[in-house]
């Protein structure tokens, strides 16, 4: 059992999945969301014994983290992120965290336009070919939740520009970059 403290910021699909995986890997987990957490995510977190809070950030708990998993919608300029940065607490993404705990092949698709169509088509082709494949990222379920609760040999992952932030050691087996426009 690890006594390392993981703080997850954001209680949506990405954050909830990361919190469940961290809990199952033996981390001391705290999830915090400045907004309201949907009931389905509260139920998921409760079912795995993950402690959480909503509509606030308890700084003393967040700033005691050994590592922070940040959901893609949280800007680096948010006050809590600035405080985390000043303390040099490592910040990673859900995808980065999940990648540590699976040997599955990763097919990652990013770019400005055509990501979802290409991701869904790739998933369909691989599934039709008889592969044990999961769909994650911007479409499908949280990669971390799937790594925690399911087994797939291949994951097809749609990655937005925001999801690419805070990824450092994650390695895709296949990487596809669609069109890139100035807004990305």
Predicted region positions:
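Phosphate-binding loop of NTP-binding sites
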Residues: 60-63, 72-184
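N-terminal leader/targeting and accessory segments in enzymes
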Residues: 1-93, 97
């Amino acid at each position: 059992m690890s006594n390392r403290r993981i703080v997850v910021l954001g209680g949506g699909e990405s954050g909830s999945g990361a919190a469940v995986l961290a809990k199952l890997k033996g981390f001391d987990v705290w999830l915090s969301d400045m907004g309201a957490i949907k009931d389905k995510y509260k139920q998921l977190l409760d079912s795995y014994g993950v402690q959480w809070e909503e509509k606030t950030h308890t700084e003393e708990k967040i700033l005691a983290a050994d590592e922070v998993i940040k959901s893609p919608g949280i800007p680096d300029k948010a006050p809590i992120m600035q405080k985390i940065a000043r303390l040099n607490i490592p910040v990673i993404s859900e995808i980065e965290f999940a990648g540590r705990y699976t040997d599955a092949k990763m097919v990652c698709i990013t770019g400005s336009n055509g990501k979802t169509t290409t991701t869904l088509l790739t998933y369909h082709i691989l599934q039709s070919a008889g592969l044990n494949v999961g769909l994650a990222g911007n479409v499908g379920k949280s990669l971390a939740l799937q790594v925690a609760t399911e087994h797939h040999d291949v994951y097809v992952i749609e990655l937005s520009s925001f999801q690419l932030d805070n990824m450092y050691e994650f390695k895709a087996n296949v990487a596809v970059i669609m069109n890139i426009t100035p807004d990305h």
